[in-house]
Every structure is written in C-alpha cells, then in structure tokens.
Amino acid sequence: MHEITLCQRALELIEQQAAKHGAKRVTGVWLKIGAFSCVETSSLAFCFDLVCRGSVAEGCKLHLEEQEAECWCETCQQYVTLLTQRVRRCPQCHGDMLQIVADDGLQIRRIEIDQE
C-alpha cells in the first residue's frame, strides 16, 4: 500500500505551505490522482485521514479528482482518452503506438486554510 507514503509526503508539503501562510488549520485539500498512479481512491482517503490526525490538517475536507487516461497516438496523430487503463490501444485507429500524457503521480491542486 503506497497510499500511506503518498499521504505522508503530501502532508509534509501541506504543513509547509500552511506554516508559510500563517494558517491555524487546513480546512480543505484538493488532490489530483494521475490516471496511471495505481492509487485506490478509497485507500488514499483512509490513509489521508489517518496521517492528518494530530496535525494542522486534522479533520480537513479531502477533494479527489481522478485524471483521465490520456495518450498521444503516433498513428492517427491525435490525443485520445483510453477506454480503460489496461487496454493500451487507440480507441480511434486501434493502433498501439501510444505515448502516455496522463500523469502517474499525485498533485496537490489547492489548499484551503483558516488563519484565525
């Protein structure tokens, strides 16, 4: 389960930004999950709640956005969204010369803080 490690690292960054901006607490966090990150959203939410306990982000609202599996097809020269992450064929021309455009990581998109 690499979700716990991702959450621990995200919390480090969140705490750094909260301190930088004089936050008393973090009230919301928006995370974008890469289409090829192999992250289970339910596990991520559970782990995030767990690692935030006792921190400035305890009890904050977690917003998760899942990125689509976007690729560039060398054969038909267009961006396509894969029907599933497991099938690596272009849905337009059925070619297999795809370059993955979608991320395989986790991004902190936004942090909402309370300064009072």
From Swiss-Prot:
Keywords: Cell inner membrane, Cell membrane, Membrane, Metal-binding, Nickel, Zinc. GO terms for molecular function: identical protein binding; metallochaperone activity; nickel cation binding; zinc ion binding. Disruption phenotype: Disruption of the gene prevents development of hydrogenase 3 activity, does not influence the level of hydrogenase 1 and leads to a considerable increase in hydrogenase 2 activity. HypA-hybF double mutant is completely blocked in maturation of hydrogenases 1, 2 and 3. However, the inclusion of high nickel concentrations in the medium can restore limited activity of all three hydrogenases. It is found in: Cell inner membrane. GDP-loaded state of HypB enhances HypA-HypB complex formation and nickel transfer. InterPro entries: Hydgase_Ni_incorp_HypA/HybF_CS, HypA/HybF. Gene3D superfamilies: 3.30.2320.80. GO terms for biological process: protein maturation; protein modification process; protein-containing complex assembly. GO terms for cellular component: GTPase complex; plasma membrane. Zn(2+) binds at C73, C76, C90, C93. Ni(2+) binds at H2. The keyword Transferase does not apply. Changing H2Q: Can bind nickel, but with reduced affinity. Decreases nickel transfer from HypB and cannot support hydrogenase maturation. Its main location: membrane. Homodimer. Forms complexes with HypB and SlyD, and interacts with HycE, the large subunit of hydrogenase 3. Belongs to the HypA/HybF family. Involved in the maturation of [NiFe] hydrogenases. Required for nickel insertion into the metal center of the hydrogenase. Mediates transfer of nickel, but not zinc, from the low-affinity metal-binding site in the GTPase domain of HypB to HypA. HypA is involved in maturation of hydrogenase 3. It may partially substitute for the function of HybF and vice versa. May act as a scaffold for assembly of the nickel insertion proteins with the hydrogenase precursor protein after delivery of the iron center. This is Hydrogenase maturation factor HypA. It comes from Escherichia coli (strain K12).
